[in-house]
Amino acid sequence: MVRAELDKQPSDVRRMFDAVARRYDVTNDVLSMGQDRRWRRAVIAAVDPQPGERVLDLAAGTGTSSQPFADRGASVVPCDFSLGMLRVGKSALPHLPFTAGDGTRLPFADATFDAVTISFGLRNIVDPLSGLRELHRVTRPGGRLVVCEFSHPTFAPFRTVYLEYLMRALPSIARAVSSAPDAYVYLAESIRAWPDQEGLAAMVAEAGWRAPAWRNLSGGIVALHRATR
């Protein structure tokens, strides 16, 4: 069984993502019913990358989330600590500067980036607050943060249906399409244990970011948090 537990030991999380790398993008598309593409577009709009800006895309995986920044003329650095993900990404997008790095100890100097973003990865860092502080460290003063992460649906009846999907349907569907379906049991458990929108905004502020705010996507299944260095 290739999966991590909720204590999120880095070696377990790394092995889990190495195992799912080959079919990661396809599986995400199926499990989200295509919504992942909409969420990625929302991240790009929130970051609003300008030509020549330096953007860090942390937990970039295979680089699917990074390429749109390059398409807008930004200098994007996809960073991930799963070598399996990086290998798949480098094979598909050889022009991007894929970089191996731990979210709690980023291999970049202070104030390197104009904008930093992490999509569906903060939840997997062993210490999310440390991860947010590291992102703060490598961002220039006045730079911006965008976090796209699973959250808590705002409509109570829908929340009940969504939790049922997470805990029952999602792992079953993953068994049909993923190269490591047990990893998606961890996905469901980690989403259920993650803070709500207000809780994550408080964590962003505690890490030193200014004026954290968020907007909900897909009824709160996902929340897009923004803040300034």
From Swiss-Prot:
Residue ranges the record marks as coiled coil: none
Pfam families: Ubie_methyltran (PF01209)
EC category name: transferase
Catalytic activity of the protein: a 2-demethylmenaquinol + S-adenosyl-L-methionine = a menaquinol + S-adenosyl-L-homocysteine + H(+)
EC number(s) reported in the record: 2.1.1.163
GO biological process, one term: methylation
Keywords (A to Z) from UniProt: Menaquinone biosynthesis, Methyltransferase, S-adenosyl-L-methionine, Transferase
Alphabetized InterPro entries for the sequence: SAM-dependent_MTases_sf, UbiE/COQ5_MeTrFase, UbiE/COQ5_MeTrFase_CS
Record pathway: Quinol/quinone metabolism; menaquinone biosynthesis; menaquinol from 1,4-dihydroxy-2-naphthoate: step 2/2
Residues bound to S-adenosyl-L-methionine: 62, 80, 102-103, 119
GO MF terms held by the record: demethylmenaquinone methyltransferase activity
Superkingdom of the source species: Bacteria
PROSITE patterns: SAM_MT_UBIE (PS51608), UBIE_1 (PS01183), UBIE_2 (PS01184)
Purpose of the protein: Methyltransferase required for the conversion of demethylmenaquinol (DMKH2) to menaquinol (MKH2).
Similarity section: Belongs to the class I-like SAM-binding methyltransferase superfamily. MenG/UbiE family.
HAMAP family listed in its UniProt record: MenG_UbiE_methyltr (MF_01813)
Protein's UniProt name: Demethylmenaquinone methyltransferase
